[in-house]
Swiss-Prot record:
Function: Induces cardiac myocyte hypertrophy in vitro. Binds to and activates the ILST/gp130 receptor.
Lineage: Eukaryota, Metazoa, Chordata, Craniata, Vertebrata
PANTHER family: CARDIOTROPHIN-1, PTHR21353
Keywords assigned by UniProt, alphabetized: Cytokine, Secreted
Similarity-based family: Belongs to the IL-6 superfamily.
Domain of life: Eukaryota
Pfam families to which the protein is assigned, alphabetical: LIF_OSM
Tissue-specific expression: Expressed in the ventricle and atrium of adult rats. Also detected in the lung, kidney, liver, skeletal muscle, stomach and urinary bladder. Not detected in brain, colon, testis, spleen or thymus. Overexpressed in the ventricles in the case of hypertension and hypertrophy.
Protein's recorded name: Cardiotrophin-1
GO molecular function: cytokine activity; leukemia inhibitory factor receptor binding
Gene Ontology CC terms, in alphabetical order: extracellular region; extracellular space
GO BP of this protein: cell surface receptor signaling pathway via JAK-STAT; immune response; leukemia inhibitory factor signaling pathway; nervous system development; neuron development
Localization in the cell: Secreted
Amino acid sequence: MSQREGSLEDHQTDSSFSFLPHLEAKIRQTHNLARLLTKYADQLLEEYVQQQGEPFGLPGFSPPRLPLAGLSGPAPSHAGLPVSERLRQDAAALSALPALLDAVRRRQAELNPRAPRLLRSLEDAARQVRALGAAVETVLAALGAAARGPVPEPVATSALFTSNSAAGVFSAKVLGLHVCGLYGEWVSRTEGDLGQLVPGGVA
């Protein structure tokens, strides 16, 4: 671990540690954005399910978890990592989400053209998560723990999102559900990780 990273981790155990005022303000601002997007993500997931028809939303329905190239949910070990590494992983996931959300929106425009609210929500989610990712990267850079290079955008989902067969449509709906779920998981995780840097925040 570098000396800079060590200083960042010391914040978790040393209550006297404080950031420069402008950095503290940026952390609070980014944390507030993550908290707001966590709320929006719950609404997006609910709205998405409502628009997919049966069996989505039925009690006991458990859709298969289809793989997504370049993105998965936070690993169980995530919480045990140093906060700087957690934020790096958050930033990487957030950078991958806009392209996936855009792909879901395009497919939903074909499947549910009369659901403008859902389409707008997906468009807003892609824009907002892009802004959150940029803000997290700014915080990391200011802390001397910048993200380790760009993450390639996932491209292997295109065939599943565009197939018009019955199986392809169902898979596209399931993938969209998965993307909306991952969006919620990562913005919530980002909120929690940033909360450890906010003065008075809880671990």
